[in-house]
């Protein structure tokens, strides 16, 4: 089961970065291998935002759609994502964001397993490179949108 953790300082506000992360339907514009993103349900409460969303990810003939439950805890600056349907046996990822001097310190953790053994083996081999590309894509997008 691949798992990893990345920490970065991104030159934008916590609010802007969180809004970008929660804008799942825009992921195909910048996230590598993301073919579509669709939010099915969104519940914005005073203390949290909860969503259910589909992401279709893949390359060439290998593409799959999975459904996740996304919870943003407003007071903690924390976004939790858990798999609730699709090809993943297990998915947990967490974004923790703290604002420091008008920048955001981001700590991203991910742990997942694909149900299909062959896909799982393929992902394990390219996981580190893929995760770096995705993390860099989020950073590049934030810089493009929020810095001058």
Language model features by range: what are they?
Residues 1-48, 102:
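Hydrophobic ligand-binding cavity/cleft-lining segments
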Residues 17-21, 27, 53, 70, ...:
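Hydrophobic pocket/interface hotspot
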Residues 28-29, 36, 41-43, 56-105, ...:
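Hydrophobic-ligand binding "helix-grip"
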Residues 114-148:
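A conserved amphipathic terminal alpha-helix motif
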Residues 20-23, 49-54, 75-81:
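Short Pro/Gly-enriched beta-strand edge/turn motifs at strand-loop
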């Amino acid at each position: 089961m691949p798992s990893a953790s990345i920490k970065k300082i991104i030159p934008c506000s916590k609010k802007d970065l969180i809004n970008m992360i929660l804008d799942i339907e825009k992921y195909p514009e910048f996230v590598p291998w993301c073919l579509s993103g669709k939010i099915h349900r969104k519940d914005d409460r005073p203390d949290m935002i909860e969503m259910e969303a589909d992401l279709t990810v893949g390359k060439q003939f290998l593409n799959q759609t999975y459904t996740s439950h996304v919870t943003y805890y407003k007071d903690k600056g924390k976004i939790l994502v858990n798999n609730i349907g699709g090809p993943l046996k297990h998915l947990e990822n967490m974004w923790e964001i703290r604002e420091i001097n008008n920048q955001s310190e981001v700590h991203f953790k991910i742990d997942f397993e694909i149900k299909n053994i062959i896909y799982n083996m393929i992902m394990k081999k390219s996981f580190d490179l893929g995760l770096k590309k995705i993390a860099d894509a989020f950073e590049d997008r934030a810089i493009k949108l929020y810095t001058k």
